[in-house]
């Protein structure tokens, strides 16, 4: 029996990397992607292949619709299409909204939200034809509560939550499930800007008393990929009780 396929965008590091490893360990053929850290993507591919997994690297900027179309043509040519899509590509921007440039705003929205739209648009026709598929969006608690000095990031994740709920209703008749994970503070490079005092203060605000790990987030993503089909349209918080 041929293995299922999954594309994890933004998978060279952090949550995306952990997701790729989790899916590979579960027997999926994993398509991995990133925009700039192609050396890390190569390392990840070799790690998966060396462990006996199935992996294909597809570097490219998923905030560009033409690039996304090219990526999906390669997936279709090699495996026919996707069973699972994990929209993980994302960037943060910290600073006052009044200081943001138009380009900075567009870059955050395009990377975090438009990329999910482009990938969903390409993945859905194959899933509909099979009457089966899963789309999992990596969101954030800031999409629900908002974060000071992270207006663009918060707005992009709120949009991703809305996309999740709306698309779940649109695709449920075709037996395609769409869910999101609203991550709390996860110990990845994205939070590397925090100094020791800022980190300690943030940990004090989290009831669990610590940051989450990328592996914990990936475990929930894998669970959603294999969850009952009646579970759809949900934005599931994974935040150590923060919200």
Predicted features and spans:
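Conserved glycine-rich cofactor-binding loop
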Residues: 12-13
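Substrate-binding pocket helix/loop in short-chain dehydrogenase/reductase
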Residues: 96-97, 104-109, 198, 202
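Active-site helix of classical SDR
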Residues: 120, 156, 164
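Alpha-helical segment proximal to the catalytic Tyr-Lys
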Residues: 125, 169-173
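Residue(s) in the substrate-gating loop at a strand-loop-helix junction
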Residues: 140
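Short, small/polar-rich loop/turn modules that mediate ligand/substrate recognition or access, typified
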Residues: 172, 177, 231-233
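A conserved structural motif in NAD(P)-dependent oxidoreductases
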Residues: 206-217
């Amino acid at each position: 029996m041929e293995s299922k396929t999954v594309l994890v965008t933004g998978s060279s590091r952090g949550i995306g990397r952990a997701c790729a490893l989790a899916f590979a360990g579960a027997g999926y053929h994993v398509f991995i992607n990133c925009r700039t850290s192609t050396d890390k993507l190569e390392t990840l591919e070799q790690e998966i292949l060396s462990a006996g997994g199935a992996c294909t690297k597809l570097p490219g900027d998923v905030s560009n619709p033409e690039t996304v179309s090219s990526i999906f043509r390669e997936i279709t040519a090699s495996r026919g299409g996707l069973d699972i899509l994990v929209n993980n590509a994302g960037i943060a921007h910290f600073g006052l909204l009044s200081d943001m440039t138009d380009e900075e705003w567009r870059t955050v929205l395009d990377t975090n939200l438009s990329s999910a739209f482009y990938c969903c648009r390409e993945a859905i026709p194959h899933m509909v034809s099979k009457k089966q598929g899963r789309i999992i969006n990596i969101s954030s608690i800031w999409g629900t509560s908002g974060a000071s000095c992270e207006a663009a990031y918060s707005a992009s994740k709120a949009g991703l939550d809305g996309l999740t709920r709306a698309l779940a209703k649109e695709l449920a008749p075709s037996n395609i499930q769409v869910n999101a994970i609203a991550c709390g503070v996860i110990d990845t490079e994205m939070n590397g800007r925090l100094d020791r005092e800022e980190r300690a203060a943030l940990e004090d605000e989290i009831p669990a008393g610590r940051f989450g790990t990328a592996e914990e987030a990936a475990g929930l993503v894998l669970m959603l990929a294999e969850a009952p089909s009646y579970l759809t349209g949900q934005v599931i918080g994974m935040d150590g009780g923060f919200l």
